[in-house]
Amino acid sequence: MITNSLQKTKVKICGIKDLEIAKICKEEGADYIGFNFVSSSPRKIELSNAQKIVEYYKSEKNSPEIVLLFYQNSFEEIESITSVLDHDLVQWVWDDPLINRKKLLYKRQICSYRVQTQIHDQDLKDIEAEFLILDSYSKGVGGGTGETFNWELISKVKRKFLLAGGLDPSNVVNAIEIVKPFGVDVASGVESSPGIKDPQKVIQFIRNVKSTS
């Protein structure tokens, strides 16, 4: 993907569960944070905790945009959460068998596409989303595996996307230099254990990304 050299690489920190980490994301200049509502994920956030973060962000200037992540959730569950929790975007997974794409058309969307083979823009033409997340594939898991994939498989994609899959503070600069994505997305790569964000890793990841812009 060829990006505008003057454009700053966007940063999304996914799987935020507590206010402390949310504050760090804002202070360090993250562009997006993700609330995970996948029932099987160690990163699933309680609605009450999500509300606290939303209220804090609403009281502050220049807060990150809030993304609500769903995978194998019923539409009723998605609707019940999105109707009571202020947010900016909804993130869904392209091969999620439960997703009703038509019912999401009125929302700002991010689609997570899990890469298995070489893909081109033509392969992605039917995906209606503000931008994509190109992530590693793992059967039955919607993301957050901590596994990278062969970036050559997306070398022909010019559509706007966030690169995900196995990124961490030690490799994100190299990933940006090679892939030149619109932005990067991280979950497990800034954790001390599954679902537990490490403040220093979050800080270092964001600063490393910002250093490339």
UniProtKB/Swiss-Prot annotation:
It comes from the Bacteria. Its EC number is 5.3.1.24. Pathway: Amino-acid biosynthesis; L-tryptophan biosynthesis; L-tryptophan from chorismate: step 3/5. It is an enzyme of class 5 (isomerase). Pfam families: PRAI (PF00697). GO terms for biological process: L-tryptophan biosynthetic process. Keywords: Amino-acid biosynthesis, Aromatic amino acid biosynthesis, Isomerase, Tryptophan biosynthesis. GO terms for molecular function: phosphoribosylanthranilate isomerase activity. It catalyses: N-(5-phospho-beta-D-ribosyl)anthranilate = 1-(2-carboxyphenylamino)-1-deoxy-D-ribulose 5-phosphate. Belongs to the TrpF family. This is N-(5'-phosphoribosyl)anthranilate isomerase. It comes from Leptospira interrogans serogroup Icterohaemorrhagiae serovar Lai (strain 56601). The gene is trpF.
